[in-house]
């Protein structure tokens, strides 16, 4: 795996994690694990026998302005991997410097990835840029979600100031299938209907039956949720005041 070079002479934590999964002896195995800085992983475990479950560990003190984190993962052919995190990613207040999180996930032929991290919480005054890219083969399978919490609504705290730029991309066989951007600045939450919870769930390769079933389940969220199916990509988007409803 080619590692991404970290920028030098910057304030904040610079961290990188390179992962590769290969099928060995009848199961998916983490064969490459290279890290720089505070990004690391727990020991893989196998509650589903052949499927490799892995927990990513972000810096324990949270993410602040000037931090730059890069995660690269390759899931080789015929592998099945579930990647999650033990807790939410917290982006704290910054005096102006941006915190950056770049995530690059590549799925080879017939590979399956369940990308199920906990939510990302953005404290008032945080300045964060997130960029997540999935590179798929047409024969691979992806289940992923992207959960954002603006402020801390459980204690009545809103994202009254700060900035968030979130970019989500899915490419299939080198062609773009989804490129989505969210930009929030200066406490202006009109673009998300002033809801603190913003969620996106993705499934490839989806079908019409799944789309109809999901739309029925989204009915209680009324106008704050929707599902689409485009070229096999099933996308669910939702806004909420309650994280339990999102989950």
From Swiss-Prot:
The keyword Nuclease does not apply. Keywords: Chaperone, Cytoplasm, Nickel insertion. The keyword Cytoplasm applies. It is found in: Cytoplasm. Its main location: cytoplasm. One of its GO terms (cellular component) is cytoplasm. It comes from the Bacteria. Required for maturation of urease via the functional incorporation of the urease nickel metallocenter. PANTHER family: UREASE ACCESSORY PROTEIN D. Belongs to the UreD family. This is Putative urease accessory protein UreD homolog. The gene is ureD1.
């Amino acid at each position: 795996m080619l590692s991404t070079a970290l920028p030098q002479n910057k304030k904040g934590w610079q961290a990188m994690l390179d992962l590769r999964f290969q099928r060995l002896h009848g199961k998916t195995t983490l064969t490459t694990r290279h890290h720089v800085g505070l990004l690391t992983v727990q020991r893989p475990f196998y509650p589903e026998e052949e499927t490799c479950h892995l927990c990513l560990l972000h810096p324990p003190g949270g993410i602040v302005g000037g931090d730059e984190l890069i995660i690269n993962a390759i899931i080789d052919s015929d592998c099945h991997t579930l990647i999650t995190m033990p807790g939410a990613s917290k982006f704290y207040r910054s005096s102006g410097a941006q915190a950056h999180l770049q995530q690059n996930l590549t799925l080879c032929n017939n590979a399956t990835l369940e990308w199920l991290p906990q939510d990302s919480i953005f404290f008032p005054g945080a300045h964060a840029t997130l960029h997540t890219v999935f590179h798929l083969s047409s024969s691979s399978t992806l289940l992923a979600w992207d959960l954002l919490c603006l402020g801390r609504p459980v204690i009545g705290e809103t994202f009254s100031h700060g900035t968030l730029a979130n970019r989500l991309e899915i490419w299939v066989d080198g062609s773009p299938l989804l490129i989505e951007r969210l930009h929030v600045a200066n406490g202006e939450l009109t673009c998300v209907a002033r809801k603190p919870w913003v969620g996106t769930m993705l499934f490839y390769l989806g079908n019409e039956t799944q789309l109809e079933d999901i739309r029925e389940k989204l009915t209680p969220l009324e106008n704050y949720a929707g599902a689409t199916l485009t070229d096999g990509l099933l996308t669910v988007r939702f806004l909420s005041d309650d994280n339990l409803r999102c989950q």
